[in-house]
Amino acid sequence: VSALASEALPSIVQVTNMSLEQVQSWFGTSSTVPTKSLGSGIIFNQDDKYLYIATNNHVVSNSNSLSVTFNDNKSVSGEVVGTDEESDLAVIKVKLSSLKDSTKKAIKVATLGSSDTLKVGQQAIVIGNALGYGQSVTTGVISALNREVSIQNEDSGKTYTQEMIQTSAAVNS
């Protein structure tokens, strides 16, 4: 597990979203307050100008500014390229020119596999930014394939049903 985690960790980032949210007071008035949300991302592609990072739509929704923190704890601005509310996925990009050479040496594009070959009972390794405390690694097993899960989008209130891979590995607990 530690060898696989060491291989993958340079591809994992923390995404910080700063947004403005309308909140109601006890007296019926509303005000706009800054809010911060955190999530994980994975570097999945690079071209001559940008790194591309996959994250969750709910992490970047309503963003006023995005910050991406790499495994060397250096942060740069990110920009949303696209989102998909139904799958809760988003892609953000980071300018390569904004990265220090030391950061460029510390990170890498992830090697992605295929979920087509997964089997129930196989070991699963989950890596992510657990509750904003930094990178965490946990293990479990593939519990189910094609598990239908209904998810309600926090922003739109729409409910979507997706087929998911269920694992017993929890990174946020």
Predicted segments — roles?
Residues 1-173:
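Serine-dependent protease modules
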